[in-house]
């Protein structure tokens, strides 16, 4: 009986240890998820930005990469990527460079076709249409002959102008990934087609699938903030070897010289 009692005690201790360890692991996961949400909240809480030029008067995260007199540059990018089965990847998007020092904004609308040959070599063909932003309106630097393209650019809206993440903290049970060596991090949530952001995307784009997307918050650099790090919001509808349908958006604050324009 004494031996039996000792066995029961040992088993109980093992179960308790496993339970406590499991709770500790879950708490670490939950804490990291909360950190990732908080990191993205600083930017996503600005959505929707009805008037993009309001960003001239809004400062983002600053670190030692900034010169003292540099007010910084906002870089905004939204792009829809669609690759149907057996076809090339087509990407259509727009990027803005909003210089807070000069209060001038330049950018370009871009389309790219990405293909891969039998040897796995990737080829990319891209076209850019340059423009300026004045009074919250896009003004191409040169006349556009193609009326379809002209209207697409004229009516283009960045996701940051209509997206809404006021309930970001309510998203639960995300699939969290964190690599401190890079560092890189991500949090993934399954959305429904009834989600307001998904509805908005479907209104603006011809999305060739009825599948509901996953919301993926991913970034690199210091979680607390970094001007050389990157944060992206992705709504991924389909991602496999045969086809890819996903939307990507980012709003970043960088030193003014870190700029491709």
Swiss-Prot record:
Keyword Cell membrane found: yes
Pfam families xref list: DUF576 (PF04507)
Residues bearing a lipid moiety (N-palmitoyl cysteine): 23
Bilayer topology: Lipid-anchor
Key words of the record: Cell membrane, Lipoprotein, Membrane, Palmitate, Signal
Cell compartment(s), UniProt: Cell membrane
Lipidation feature positions (S-diacylglycerol cysteine): 23
Domain of life assignment: Bacteria
Signal found in the keyword field: yes
Gene3D superfamilies (alphabetical): 2.50.20.40
Signal peptide interval: 1-22
Major site of localization recorded for this protein: membrane
Gene Ontology CC annotation, any one: plasma membrane
The family this protein is said to belong to: Belongs to the staphylococcal tandem lipoprotein family.
Protein name (record): Uncharacterized lipoprotein SE_0186/SE_0187
Organism: Staphylococcus epidermidis (strain ATCC 12228 / FDA PCI 1200)
